[in-house]
Amino acid sequence: MVYNNINHVKEKSFVHSTFWYENMNGSQYIADKLAEELHICYDTDIKNIKYAHNKWLIEEEYFDKVIFCGNIKDMVKIVEGFDIREYEDEIVKLEYHGTTAVFCEIDKNPYSWIYQPSKQHESHRIICTGNFAKSNNGNCVPEGRITATIEFTDEISKEDIIDNLSRISLHPKYLAHKYNPYTYPIQNVHTRD
């Protein structure tokens, strides 16, 4: 998957048809391997990114490359010295679907992802994270159970989450949840220009 992305190899089947997940530390393993021998600053609140002298200046330190992992709408406000104003109107108009991700414990099963369109509940997908790596389950998950993330489109209250979980198979037990309003940009004919 990483090779295909770097070398622009087109997927010949559906988007998740090729899948790799490391047994220890999950997808974090990939990030850690890519980060080896690089100077990476994590957990830093960046208020300004300036392009000067063919380098990126951030918090009084110069960098050759910057990977922006924030909301693209914020990028327009904080980047200086690199003209992205021609895209500003389109970026401001960009719409998103948010996702409420619910961390749960569920019955052990053989699946990685379960897409579950149903009129019985509002969830659209279960990601069986406990099946990707045993270390994802930790020592607290009882025998016959695994961890999972159950996703709901847009924001949903804890009360509604609990109510929905009671109608989903695999007997999900609520552990925690987090809402991200900027999960999926809504594409249109102009957003890929």
Predicted regions, residues:
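Helical element adjacent to the flavin cofactor pocket in flavoenzyme catalytic cores
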Residues: 3-65, 69
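Residue-level signal for pocket-adjacent positions within structured domains
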Residues: 14-16, 41, 86-89, 109-111, ...
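Short, glycine/charged-rich beta-strand-loop motifs at protein surfaces that mediate ligand recognition
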Residues: 23, 151-154, 179-185
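Secondary-structure boundary/capping positions in well-ordered alpha/beta enzyme cores
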Residues: 38-41, 82, 172
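A generic structural-conservation signal
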Residues: 42-44, 100, 174
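Mid-domain catalytic core of redox enzymes
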Residues: 47-164, 168
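Flavin (FAD/FMN) cofactor-binding core of flavoprotein oxidoreductases
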Residues: 160-193
